[in-house]
Amino acid sequence: MSQEIYDYANQLERAVRALPEYQKVLEVKEAIQADVSASELFDEFVAMQEKIQGMMQSGQMPTAEEQTSIQELSQKIEANDQLKAYFEAQQALSVYMSDIERIVFAPLKDLVK
């Protein structure tokens, strides 16, 4: 039985990769990577996101200047069709991932009830 659970997990991984929503994220990501300005903007977003997450994990909040930078970056992303499509595709995929997470972790929740 223990090996079987890994087989199921691998099957789930393949199923996620086959989802049209997953394929859409890949497609849009490739388009972003082919566009220098979109790619730079995406890299800037990732760096900003990592910085903010690191700050919050250490109990710090973004300064007013950093919040302004975040807002400006968000506006640039909204104005870029490829990045906008990427985040929309990510959102559609995250619905599946959220549902899968809920299903997979249901037995663990039962243990703490």
Swiss-Prot record:
<protein>
    <recommendedName>
        <fullName>UPF0342 protein SPy_0811/M5005_Spy0626</fullName>
    </recommendedName>
</protein>
<dbReference type="InterPro" id="IPR010368">
    <property type="entry name" value="Com_YlbF"/>
</dbReference>
<dbReference type="InterPro" id="IPR023378">
    <property type="entry name" value="YheA/YmcA-like_dom_sf"/>
</dbReference>
<dbReference type="Pfam" id="PF06133">
    <property type="entry name" value="Com_YlbF"/>
</dbReference>
<comment type="similarity">
    <text>Belongs to the UPF0342 family.</text>
</comment>
